[in-house]
């Protein structure tokens, strides 16, 4: 959908229902400089909300920042949008297929968080990895840890 709020809602529904069905989040970052996938399944590793900080001092900052510059935005009539090249969705689809094919071949989706950038992108290198749960994550963490994070 391109809306982080929708991804967070899907994440919350997955956690609330305790489903074993995996959810694959795919996103284009910035103006298409890179694409990322995040495979969410079970509760042993981090959820989609664990991709941003949960503590009071760094609340909602990215745990794995990739963009060095703010994306350029455009306005057309009453709508705002982030322009990117036609190749960006193709890169996102290719990375999505890489994850799914790997899962079908091996039964595993590791690493669950993956990033691919264009060759000339001005981005930070982010390693492919399995994201650890944040103890204070408001979606999958413990209530005690969340309260402690707010107090510090």
Where are the model-predicted features located?
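Glycine-rich phosphate/adenylate-binding loop
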Residues: 1-152
């Amino acid at each position: 959908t391109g809306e982080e709020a929708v991804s967070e809602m899907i994440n919350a529904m997955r956690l609330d229902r305790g489903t074993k069905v995996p959810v694959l989040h795919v996103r284009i970052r910035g103006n298409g400089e890179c694409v990322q996938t995040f495979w969410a399944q079970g509760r042993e590793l981090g959820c989609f909300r664990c991709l941003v900080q949960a503590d009071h001092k760094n609340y909602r900052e990215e745990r794995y920042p990739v963009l060095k510059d703010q994306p350029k935005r455009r306005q057309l009539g009453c709508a705002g949008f982030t322009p990117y090249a036609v190749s960006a969705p193709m890169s996102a689809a290719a990375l999505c297929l890489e994850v799914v094919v790997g899962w079908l071949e091996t039964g595993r989706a590791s690493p669950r968080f993956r990033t691919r950038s264009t060759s000339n992108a001005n981005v930070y290198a982010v390693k492919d990895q399995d994201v650890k749960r944040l103890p204070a994550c408001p979606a999958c963490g413990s209530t005690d840890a969340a309260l402690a994070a707010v107090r510090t």
